[in-house]
Curated annotation (Swiss-Prot):
Its cofactor is Mg(2+). GO terms for molecular function: ATP binding; tRNA dimethylallyltransferase activity. It is an enzyme of class 2 (transferase). This is tRNA dimethylallyltransferase. Belongs to the IPP transferase family. InterPro entries: Dimethylallyltransferase (IPR039657), IPT (IPR018022), P-loop_NTPase (IPR027417). Pfam families: IPPT. The lineage of its organism: Bacteria, Pseudomonadati, Spirochaetota, Spirochaetia, Spirochaetales. Substrate binds at residues 13-18. GO terms for biological process: tRNA modification. Residues 35-38 are annotated as: Interaction with substrate tRNA. NCBIfam families: miaA (TIGR00174). Its EC number is 2.5.1.75. The gene is miaA. It comes from Borrelia recurrentis (strain A1). Catalyzes the transfer of a dimethylallyl group onto the adenine at position 37 in tRNAs that read codons beginning with uridine, leading to the formation of N6-(dimethylallyl)adenosine (i(6)A).
Amino acid sequence: MKTNKIVFIFGPTAVGKSDILFHFPKGVAEVISVDSIQVYKEFDIASCKPSIELRSHIRHHLVDFLEPIYEYNLGIFYKESCKIIESLREQKKIPIFVGGSAFYFKHLKYGLPSAPPVSDKVRLYINNLFIRMGKDYLLEELRRVDFKRYESINQNDIYRIKRSLEVYFQTGIPISQFLQRENMFENIVAIGLRRPMDEMKSRIISRVKNMIDCGLLDEIKSLLGKGYDEKTPAFKGIGYREFLLWRSRPCYLLNDIINLIVKNSFLYVKRQMTFFNKLPNVLWFHPDDDLKNILDLIFV
């Protein structure tokens, strides 16, 4: 088992990411949550935070630590993730990033922008070059203007190829001169979880019903009673924001709100899968049928 690896486990809402964690051996790995709502204290039920039982089985980071009034963003997530990775590597443990926030996974893989911003005009120019001339042409351009970057880049990684050329055409400086720090995220095992969409729809309906049964209405009343409202960042999450709509439109019935949560969740699942399907080098599994393969991939 390589202890310098970093594992990504991603998939859409309700696919069953947390369920497989109970099967992980104790003491050899820890989880870093990739979720923009689970970070908030008190917002427990609709965010589907990992249970106390699961957190006692395998330690979770970046869960239930931020006051609801504060914004959580990519910069905080990335900075904290880097610290956690360094700590876990010192302990010879595997960092396992688990969640469904596609935007965060993207920047875990490709890093935060460390070069100057690029104008829309330059970005459009490079993208049009790609559409008209193809990937090989862009690679040849990169070889010409930044041979160091050309030698080190994955030649199937069109995102980084385009980004490298954008920076050069914007600044006249090779991106290799901007990227001096060691990449912490080279040895990535990317595991994607997915189910058929009809199965996902059924699971979402069951999940929302369970939220109501577990006391979501009481949780929201308590949160509103403490002064949290539509300006509170944590209320942006699906399952919370719909109840703010209910408060402003008393004609809505509880069933209308439940149906709206189901609808918004399913639309979010579709957006998540659209993004995740674009990521290269992902090993896709059904979380129920392929559990042994997933465990072997991570721990053997």
